[in-house]
Amino acid sequence: MNSPADYDPKPRRASVAVDVGGVIVGGGAPVVVQSMTNTDTADIDATVRQVAALFQAGSEMVRITVDRDESAAAVPKIRERLLRLGMDVPLIGDFHYIGHKLLADHPACAEALAKYRINPGNVGFKDKKDKQFGEIVEMAIRYDKPVRIGVNWGSLDQELLTTLMDRNKEQGFPLSARQVTREAIVQSALISAELAEEIGLPRNRIILSAKVSQVQDLIAVYSMLSERSNHALHLGLTEAGMGSKGIVASSAAMGYVLQHGIGDTIRVSLTPEPNGDRTREVQVAQELLQVMGFRQFIPVVAACPGCGRTTSTVFQELAQNIQNDIRKNMPIWREKYPGVEALNVAVMGCIVNGPGESKHADIGISLPGTGESPAAPVFIDGEKALTLRGPNIAADFEALVIDYIEKRFGQKDAAE
């Protein structure tokens, strides 16, 4: 019979720590949230605005496309503008096809970036592949930059895949085509990492990723990678899709591997709605890590889903208002109230679970359900503190939450 401890998250996989512009990835460090812009990098103003928005939303690293000379020339200017805004966010250069040439032709770009992303599937073809891969690695060594060797199933090394498919055929097809493709993805990452180390890039300068678009494939390839190397791993489900589908797919895939101790940095690759908010992917990544108990980014507002006992919408509106206020104020609160991200607030809709849930929160309210007395007990630190009545219950509770934050988390400032 298993013990209760057997159902806890698996210990974090031991991986080599990599310093990316001052942010540590792997080596037992907290799982890092990152994101990517969708602006034309050559448009400096637009890119600075989006990087700033992603950074303020909580992205700890931001990847930008470097696809041509104009983009490469813009990178140091983008970096300089961000620093003037007080945003020392590591910028990751996303290179495909001609990264070796762009880094050589634009040394200021090579210096400004905190990390280079290399795709082994399109860094070069046939006899040029290893040569051009090596040139990027040599640039990373010259400028003391880490690289992410990012394999993607959509641009997988076809020579390697063909070799493995042929071998599988010779052996009588013991593996399905899907299983062979997974093996090719893993081998592409490991072979490339081995080549980078042979050239002279140390392991503490290498991060691996193996992006796929199906949940089961992600679970498989990262499980395989984790067993066969100790490189820091970047998790992400590529082409996850839009809206709830993308959120569910990314959460299901990454949640499983994170629970098994695998993963050192994550990106949730959501397709935004037209003119949608790019920062949504950062919020989802943070929420995934927070609900799994791996990190704390923002106070939690627990609220019941509602039922026939809660025909009023007051508790829903109150929970939403508090959550919105928290998100709006977190950039200030994070500095003013250290530790506030650990706060738990409960907004419950009736007597069934309301008092119990509110007692478990730092501060909670149990609003009256249908037919209940129009009174709302408030619990603070597990004890009933007072009862709110009248038409201003919501506003009164919001004021109590602010007062609680100031008293509990503002003490450190007051003592200094």
Curated annotation (Swiss-Prot):
Check the record and name the InterPro entries matching this protein: Dihydropteroate_synth-like_sf, IspG_bac, IspG_bac-typ, NO2/SO3_Rdtase_4Fe4S_sf
Recorded source organism is Agrobacterium fabrum (strain C58 / ATCC 33970) (Agrobacterium tumefaciens (strain C58))
The record's comment on cofactor binding reads: Binds 1 [4Fe-4S] cluster.
Q: What is its EC number?
A: 1.17.7.3
Q: Which domain of life is it from?
A: Bacteria
Question: So what does this thing catalyse?
Answer: (2E)-4-hydroxy-3-methylbut-2-enyl diphosphate + oxidized [flavodoxin] + H2O + 2 H(+) = 2-C-methyl-D-erythritol 2,4-cyclic diphosphate + reduced [flavodoxin]
Gene name, Swiss-Prot/TrEMBL? ispG
Listed name of the protein = 4-hydroxy-3-methylbut-2-en-1-yl diphosphate synthase (flavodoxin)
For this chain, the family text in UniProt reads:
Belongs to the IspG family.
According to the UniProt entry, where is the signal peptide? none
Q: What does this protein do?
A: Converts 2C-methyl-D-erythritol 2,4-cyclodiphosphate (ME-2,4cPP) into 1-hydroxy-2-methyl-2-(E)-butenyl 4-diphosphate.
Q: What is its cofactor?
A: [4Fe-4S] cluster
Q: Which residues bind [4Fe-4S] cluster?
A: 304, 307, 350, 357
Q: Which GO terms describe its biological process?
A: isopentenyl diphosphate biosynthetic process, methylerythritol 4-phosphate pathway; terpenoid biosynthetic process
Recorded GO molecular functions are: 4 iron, 4 sulfur cluster binding; 4-hydroxy-3-methylbut-2-en-1-yl diphosphate synthase activity (ferredoxin); 4-hydroxy-3-methylbut-2-enyl-diphosphate synthase activity (flavodoxin); iron ion binding
List keywords of the entry alphabetically: 4Fe-4S, Iron, Iron-sulfur, Isoprene biosynthesis, Metal-binding, Oxidoreductase
In which pathway is this protein known to take part?
Isoprenoid biosynthesis; isopentenyl diphosphate biosynthesis via DXP pathway; isopentenyl diphosphate from 1-deoxy-D-xylulose 5-phosphate: step 5/6
